[in-house]
Amino acid sequence: FYVILPLQYFLVAIDWFSMFTIFIPVYGFLFLPILSALLGDPAHFLDRSTKIQWALMISVFCISHIPALLTLDISGYEGKNLLLMIFLILVVQSSDVLQYVWGKLFGEHKIAPTLSPSKTVEGFVGGVLSASLLGMLLHWLTPFSAWQAFLMSLLICLMGFLGGLVMSAMKRSMGVKDWGNMISGHGGILDRMDSLCF
């Protein structure tokens, strides 16, 4: 794990796109279970391997695609890739906040009560649409037209919501409410970034 983390970001930094997109899902997922098996402790092997692979996928592989935006070569957008990264983070984080606000104000129908009891249909729809409109207004940060930015934001927000549900399912499976307590009342860093992972 401690070798794969810096290697993944090194591959991003040197802009070796074809390798950083397959390094963890192919090589990491292949060699980590082999290493675990060679260590000779078969007790809970499958459980341990699964947790390591999910940890790599979520906290390293998925997140590493955010700084990878800096390496994209977009014609007519040279030197502005940081703005694309800022756009992504603003849209995703505003979607989370706006879903919470819409849910508190108008939420009545639970969307996934066993995974995340506070999430509502009204919060989801209001938050996703509001954040997508924000993305449309922020299209000037991107190489996209206003409508392209809206559609991109809509897709980003939908995937972020689904990512949040996946992370909630993982937490419920492990019997924890939050990934940490670094941010008082809001859990850990990964709790704030779960939507960005997807």
Q: Residue ranges of each PLM-predicted region?
A:
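Membrane-embedded alpha-helical bundles of polytopic integral membrane proteins
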Residues: 1-155
